[in-house]
A protein has these predicted regions:
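Phosphopantetheine-dependent thiolation modules in NRPS/PKS and related acyl-activating systems
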Residues: 1-76
């Protein structure tokens, strides 16, 4: 997957988990209403979408779709 595809996937997951279709690629998950439980849900969905087990702190360290996609892409 390209980083752009990963970013679009993560953005869609953030929008669905947070129930906010207006989020952009630079939206902070937590500033947009996310909490730790929703973050764990989102991390699991992202992992399923990219076919990897992801660290549970991913969104805490990279809270925007753009930064999160870069981190996931760097994992290979």
């Amino acid at each position: 997957m390209t980083v752009e595809t990963i970013e679009a996937t993560i953005l869609g997951i953030f929008r669905n988990v947070l129930k906010n279709q207006d989020l952009g690629e630079d939206a902070d998950f937590f500033e947009a209403g996310g909490d730790s439980l929703l973050a764990i849900d989102a991390i699991e969905l992202i992992g399923q979408a990219v076919g990897r087990d992801l660290d549970s702190v991913l969104i805490f360290m990279f809270p925007t779709p753009e930064s999160c996609a870069g981190a996931v892409a760097d994992l290979g």
